[in-house]
Amino acid sequence: SRHSLPLSPPLFSGRIWGSSPERGDVVVFKFPPDPSLDYIKRVVGLPGDRIQMRDGELYINDQAVPRERIGQINNPDITEVSRPVDVYRETLPNGVSYETLDLSPNSVGDNTREFVVPEDHYFMMGDNRDNSTDSRFSVGFVPAENLVGRANIIFFSIAGGASPLEIWRWPTEVR
């Protein structure tokens, strides 16, 4: 199984989930249009929720999710030119908070229709809001049966301070 540690025998088939996903969980799921692909996104909508983006702000059940600008990072674009990108902290109704990136104001995903999450489905969004294939677009609602598991650790991050060649620094860069 490609979700196992190396050299471990496949002990389970299908998903392993101890409890239902909650808002703010980062989960791995099978891409609904092509279940051979695994995606990883954040759960923002639960069954029955109404989700909408208005002027770059996330609304859940007509309530704006608190969003605070906390700074900027330099982010290289596709031409490798570094440019400042705004970083925000969002706090979901259950108290889970996380950082999101806003690459540009008025991007295509900043204003959406209202999505009503069907029973046994979830609404997923990426934290890089302007550069994420998520439930606002081609991913759509994610059926519970497509969930693989919760992501609990970032093992290799391109945002980390260690180069892939600096193996000795990897343990201090795991987050």
Model-derived features: positions:
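Soluble "head" domains of membrane/secretory-pathway proteins
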Residues: S1-R175
